Amino acid sequence: MELSYFHVAKDVPSGIKPETSVVIDVLRATTTIACALNNGAEAVQTFADLDNLKEQASCWPLSKRLLLGERGGKKIDGFDLGNSPLAVTSNVVKGKRLFMSTTNGTRSLERVKESKSLYTMSFINRKAVAEKLISNQSKSVLILGSGWEGAYSLEDSLAAGALASFLLNKNPNSVHILNDELSAAVALWSCWENNIEGCLRNATHGKRLERLGNHDDDFTCCSELDKICVVPTQREKGVLCSL
């Protein structure tokens, strides 16, 4: 298995259509997606463009849809929910389609939507995603972070390193790292694997969330490792389900 990692969507070379992609947005989109599907959401449909989201959502009955998203870490005016994984409880999301747009994560999903297989990952479902890649015998995997407004993020690289380290430990002779970005992410993981939440709080996006208010419970949730077994999978372009 060949692994490569790119910090943000714009770093992915043009013309690439990956066989398999894994999108990461630890704080907080891919954590929220995993939690929503784990709690029974019918699907999470992602959008980079808000007007497109509203148009598509209008085709669904009010009782079967939720608008979910943030800009700058704050809930979008008029939306049902923001981007907290704690808000997507079973009694709120079960059986519903979530229409989601975030500052960073949905851009990365848009960039690799042509992938043959597309998954989303955070710390909370790292093992499940890694085992899915192994069981699928994926030959080439592009791991894509989301960053913050087009710039590098510490927490996404930490998660990329966590995924690569798991795969390397499982199959050291058949997993190959193709770029320095991922080698650096693996090294970062070796430094912080015993204090994930500490790394998230030290990251600039973590500090940004702290300035917006008390997000202690979000930090705790986003730093939990291998807690749930859901693998958010693109069923059709832009639509993620638990398959």
UniProtKB/Swiss-Prot annotation:
Cofactor: Mg(2+)
Keyword Cytoplasm (UniProt): no
GO MF terms held by the record: 2-phosphosulfolactate phosphatase activity; magnesium ion binding; sulfopyruvate decarboxylase activity
Reactions catalysed according to its record: (2R)-O-phospho-3-sulfolactate + H2O = (2R)-3-sulfolactate + phosphate
Keyword presence, Ribosomal protein: no
Broadest EC class assigned to this enzyme: hydrolase
One Pfam family per UniProt: 2-ph_phosp
Keywords (A to Z) from UniProt: Hydrolase, Magnesium
Alphabetical list of InterPro entries matching this protein: ComB-like (IPR005238), ComB-like_sf (IPR036702)
Record-listed E.C. numbers: 3.1.3.71
Domain of life: Bacteria
Family: Belongs to the ComB family.
PANTHER family associated with the record: 2-PHOSPHOSULFOLACTATE PHOSPHATASE-RELATED
Entry protein name: Probable 2-phosphosulfolactate phosphatase
Species this protein is from: Prochlorococcus marinus (strain SARG / CCMP1375 / SS120)
